[in-house]
Amino acid sequence: MPSPRSLLLVFAHPDDESFGVGGTAALYAAAGARVSLACATKGERGTTDPALAGQKLGAIREGELRRACAILGVADVSFLGYMDADVDKADFDGLVEAIAAVMRRARPSAVVTFGPDGVTRHPDHVAVGRAATAAFHRVRRQEGYRYPRRLYYVALPESRRKVFRSGDALMYTPDEQITAAVDISRVLDVKLKAIACHKSQEDARSFLAHADEWKASGEMTQECFVRAWPRGKRKDSTLFPG
């Protein structure tokens, strides 16, 4: 049986966990929940420096991810062994089964991943979100619907567009479609420390350069989600089933 408070995060690259759900992971881990992560790649191509790309960068980013997860309290990290920027080209059923295998081990009560827009429309994000959704339903059927019980997609509410001034780089969700908002104000600094672990990434450096401005706006105190299962418009006060 699943733990009543266990959370599995399923993402594509090192740093997705810190940007997307770092506060939620830290908050729940500190409260005693078991938080696990499945990461499809090691981010081997996340650089403009050809001398760094490949296994060397993958090793660097794996270390960054493990340090970030230690800060957040993520108890277990599983790398799925896919190549950065090629996940969308991989055999889909193989990806689904790789994620399903982690779900069977972790036995989570709730799963968080990317929605259809991948937040940034990155093909790896979209592929991982689709596969995680398929794996969620596959494992539920195989396990007699005992677990996992809830599926959430990371979402950026439309109201934050004016704060982040990201143009078309990020995909936003109408505020009324948000079904869960986790208050991370108590662990916001923990989230920022985790993001800072990803030193090799320009996105992390840029985010931290604007962090004080965004903190002052009050728009960084919540992480938001759309509940993909069970469907419905009910608002959740927690990601865990009652």
Locate each region found by the language model.
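Active-site rim/loop-helix segments in enzyme catalytic domains that contact anionic ligands
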Residues: 1-106, 133-134, 138-142, 226, ...
